[in-house]
Amino acid sequence: MLVVISPAKRLDWAERDVATTEPAFQDDAVRLAKTARNLTLGDLKKLMGLSDDLARLNRDRFREFADAPGADVTRPAALAFAGDTYQGLEAASLDSEEMDWAQQHLRILSGLYGVLRPLDAIQAYRLEMGSRLKTRRGTSLYDYWGDQLSRTLNAQADEIGTDVLVNCASQEYFGAVDPKALKLRVITPVFMEDKGGAPKIVSFFAKKARGAMARYIVQRRLTDPQALSEFDSGGYQYNADLSAPDKPVFLRPYQG
């Protein structure tokens, strides 16, 4: 199985003694960064709903974005992202064999880099997939990426001999994957909290659970989609009544 997750807004830029790989869409990232660096502070604030300080930070990041970055300004993607999903993934605690498997089977969808492997070297950035950044290809990043992400995922799935993609990404990011171009069966786990017999999705918990599901798949080297139902991290249990064949639902008592 191939697994996809979203990136994170927050970064952990601690130095890592880990060999990195080059992103498949490095040239596109450079092109997009050059487009973004021409925006005014006001444009950046509006583009991503940023405060003044965050707009300045990300303007400076785009201005400093290197065409051929060295190790001093890059970090491995799965270790650099630090949001809720990555609390569940806990990439830093994966051993070398688990990380090798993740490098083949886990992908991070990115507004700037398109598709990343866990050890791909990224520069510090923030550019959400839903951003309406105008380029020669259109008025949004969805226009920019077109069917490229789908074609890349098809090819990478073919390399590992699978026709199944487990979608642990958010709707914002998986929306960049063109369904008409994608040739894979998509399974989307759903994580819900049961509060008084009324199951509901709580964003913070769901993000962390999606990362935990990705970790579960990596650590067990799962290839059979039916094995996903055995996931029980964080107190979640598979609920057959709420589930559909390609949308397994996991439920736990409300944690609030």
From Swiss-Prot:
Pfam families hit by this protein: H2O2_YaaD (PF03883)
Cellular component GO terms held in the UniProt record: cytosol
Superkingdom of origin organism: Bacteria
A biological process from GO: response to hydroperoxide
InterPro entries: YaaA
Family label: Belongs to the UPF0246 family.
Family matches, as HAMAP family: UPF0246
Record-given protein name: UPF0246 protein SPO0106
Organism per entry: Ruegeria pomeroyi (strain ATCC 700808 / DSM 15171 / DSS-3)
